[in-house]
Design a protein with these regions (language model features):
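Functional-site microenvironments in short loops/helix caps that host divalent-cation chemistry
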Residues: 1-91, 99-102
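Short, structured beta-strand segments at or near domain termini in extracellular proteins/domains
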Residues: 100-113
């Protein structure tokens, strides 16, 4: 929401976090009223990670592989990362059974329809 220059009022990252996590909602919301869309913790999303995942998957409700040990995507960067890693378009793989990283979390979401 801040253009080409990061506005520290909206995000926790390695440059302003004091190298620790912070309560949700302590930064300003984005223009859509959503808090902590970047920084804070990396967030698990339901997308599966693969080199060609977006190219080869259906647009609506892709199922992903049936293997529980398949890679999922984490997004958004965290309070330990440099600012170049704190953006919505960045994605990294994470194993679905590896949940012990204290800089990775998840976001609850629901369909508005």
């Amino acid at each position: 929401p801040w253009g080409d220059k990061m506005d520290r009022n909206y995000v926790w990252y390695g440059g302003n976090s004091g190298h620790t996590h912070h309560p949700v909602g302590t930064r300003k919301p984005n223009p859509w009223g959503l808090y902590d869309m970047l920084g804070g913790v990396w967030e698990w999303v339901s997308d599966w990670y693969g080199e060609f995942y977006y190219k080869n998957s259906p647009i609506n409700n892709p199922k992903g592989p049936s293997n529980i040990l398949s890679w999922h995507v984490i997004r958004g960067g965290s309070w330990i990362d440099d600012k170049q890693f704190v953006r919505t378009t960045i994605r990294y793989p994470g194993l679905a059974d590896n949940t012990d990283d204290y800089w990775v979390g998840f976001r609850c979401a629901r369909d508005l329809n």
